[in-house]
Every structure is written in structure tokens, then in C-alpha cells.
């Protein structure tokens, strides 16, 4: 209603993963995958990890395949390839994950499949390795808005930076104090260091709260103030005590 039907049709509203999936539907063949690909579910992923463990002579009775899969996913969210850590650092699971990762990826590709994390990683690879794809997407998406920015991971940030191109027309909405998903890869530093990735940023603080009483907000302000690694803000309300 605000922008009109014609302009509304020009908008793309979706999650990071839905966006990545659409990019892959159009361009994944450029990376040697079939034009029609499948998205592996949790059961498929676990099966492929167990196969990779057998191929590398790793006993799945000694190492939990589910934990290995979780570490593979964690690495993908961070945008890194698991590698053996220097002696004295890490543990045996780091070594197992580093050994399993390449075989797991090859097994996915051999089946014409990607996993959920690949919906972010493979579009990044496409943009890096195929300038024509990057130019097309940067031109198509000139303005980018990301909600709940404190919940983004490193791979999502990398994709956003590449899509923003030289224009860097990015609006992020989020609250570092509400970052609670680090256990699944979210990095609060993405919002804390926003101005490093997108210079000349204008910051707008939305400190008025419409849900809680001032007594609750005072308690919340006191608790969160202990955290030194945050954007300074103080919530208030017009609702009274």
C-alpha cells in the first residue's frame, strides 16, 4: 500500500537461504552441478558423513557422526574449510572433521545435492568465480535490507558484502543485546562492526519500548550494562511504572 502495486512487484522479500536457493537454481550448473539439484535433509547428511568416515577409516563407534556433522555445519556458517589445528590445539574431533569435510562435499556433489549451509556458501563461490553472475545480481539488487541482523553468521555477511558491491546500499535492523543464536553460528560482531564493512553508516537508535513497563526496562538496562562489548543504548517507555 505504501509503495504501490507496481513497485511492490519489484521487491524480493525472502530469507538468506531462499535467496541463495534461487541463485543456485539459475547458476549452480556453472560449478559443475546438474541444473536440477536436490537439497539434502538431515538424514541424507548424516548418511553421507558416516560414509565419509568409513572411507577415511574413522570408526563411527568412537566418534559421533552427528557431532562431526554439527562441526561441518559450524565451519560452513563461519565460511571456513575445516583444517587440522596446530599440535596442542583443538581435539580429535577437529582432525576427524577436517578429514571428513572434503569427502562429504564430494559425495553431495556426486548425488547432485547441496545441504542447507551450501545455500549460502555456493552462491558466494559463484559470485567470486563468475564475475558475470556477480554483476547481474549487484545490478538487480541495488538496495538491501536485512532484519534481525544480530542473528546473521559470517557466511551471510560475506554474501551481503558481495551483493552490496561498490554502492553499499545496505540497511540493517537489529539489536546486539538480543543476540542469542551464537550456538548455531550467529556472530554478534557482524552488527558491532557494521561500519567497518559499510562505511559512512548512519545509525538510528530505537530506544523507546512499547511492550514493557519502566520497572522491567530499568532491570533489563542494569543487567545488560555489564556487557562492555555492545552498542550503548538505554530503553525507556511512555507507559509508566
Language model feature labels by segment:
Residues 1-35, 39, 111, 134-135, ...:
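P-loop NTPase Walker
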Residues 12, 38-44, 90-193, 205-215:
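Conserved helicase NTPase motor core
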Residues 18-19, 73, 201-202:
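N-terminal helical cap/lid subdomain that shapes the substrate entry/recognition surface
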Residues 22-28, 180-197, 214, 218-221, ...:
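Short regulatory helix/loop adjacent to the ATP-binding pocket of P-loop NTPases
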Residues 42-108:
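Coupling/switch/interface segments within P-loop NTPase motor domains and analogous charged loops
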Residues 60-70, 82, 86-87, 204-241:
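Coupling/hinge elements of helicase-like and P-loop NTPase modules
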Residues 172, 196-199, 237-241:
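Short, flexible turn/loop "capping" segments at secondary-structure junctions
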